[in-house]
Amino acid sequence: MKEIVIASNNQGKINDFKVIFPDYHVIGISELIPDFDVEETGSTFEENAILKSEAAAKALNKTVIADDSGLEVFALNGEPGIYSARYAGENKSDEANIEKLLNKLGNTTDRRAQFVCVISMSGPDMETKVFKGTVSGEIADGKYGENGFGYDPIFYVPKLDKTMAQLSKEQKGQISHRRNAINLLQAFLEGEKNV
């Protein structure tokens, strides 16, 4: 069985990859390097994902997958972007990030936004590959729903007439930015199998 190493300490992400890649042995990097951490010094999701996957691939001499993701709000020139997890400051809660975003948007009528996920795959004998997924929506006027995490309670998906937090895990999994990026990664891996 082929192995996929995920350059993340986030068990939720690792579990998502395990479900999506049942034919692979999926392990988190902390199982191999307990204190692995890469400072995200890039200015884009792509740069940060590549920093993580290339550092992990070099440390392990193995093929590694990493991702970087976040929310971009058009009226805020793409904020919070790469700072999505720490928009209100280091170690602040999802609630604090949401509050800052809603306050900054105020009564702005242009509430278009997108979730972005960039997955990068690096290895010792390969050029780094990058796969980007997005999901478009709008920022709601308040929080709705109990599911999900992060900005899900305020990310409204017009075609479903619900926020991400009002969707079941299965519904969100079918349309999410991470799912879209993983679909591209899967297509690439399937193509590699058939070569």
UniProtKB/Swiss-Prot annotation:
**Name listed for the protein in its UniProt record:** dITP/XTP pyrophosphatase
What's the superkingdom here? Bacteria
* Described purpose of this protein according to its UniProt entry: Pyrophosphatase that catalyzes the hydrolysis of nucleoside triphosphates to their monophosphate derivatives, with a high preference for the non-canonical purine nucleotides XTP (xanthosine triphosphate), dITP (deoxyinosine triphosphate) and ITP. Seems to function as a house-cleaning enzyme that removes non-canonical purine nucleotides from the nucleotide pool, thus preventing their incorporation into DNA/RNA and avoiding chromosomal lesions.
Q: Which keywords fit this entry according to its UniProt record? A: Hydrolase, Magnesium, Metal-binding, Nucleotide metabolism, Nucleotide-binding
Keyword Isomerase found: no
Q: Name the residues that bind substrate.
A: S8, N9, N10, Q11, G12, K13, S69, F149, G150, Y151, D152, K172, H177, R178
| GO CC annotation terms, alphabetical | cytosol
